[in-house]
Amino acid sequence: MAVKKAALACSVCGSRNYSITANSNRTKRLELNKFCKHCGKKTLHKETR
């Protein structure tokens, strides 16, 4: 079971605001509502690999 580094990118402006360690066995990409400092509000962030 390998742990892989990934980033969470804002779906509005595209900036990569958060870095996470994720299990590579997961098939779907992680989607979370997080605060984007560039947009100034909570937006949907999607996992980028």
Swiss-Prot record:
Keywords: Ribonucleoprotein, Ribosomal protein. It comes from the Bacteria. InterPro entries: Ribosomal_bL33 (IPR001705), Ribosomal_bL33_sf (IPR038584), Ribosomal_zn-bd (IPR011332). GO terms for biological process: translation. Pfam families: Ribosomal_L33. One of its GO terms (cellular component) is ribosome. GO terms for molecular function: structural constituent of ribosome. HAMAP family: Ribosomal_bL33 (MF_00294). Belongs to the bacterial ribosomal protein bL33 family. This is Large ribosomal subunit protein bL33B. The gene is rpmG2.
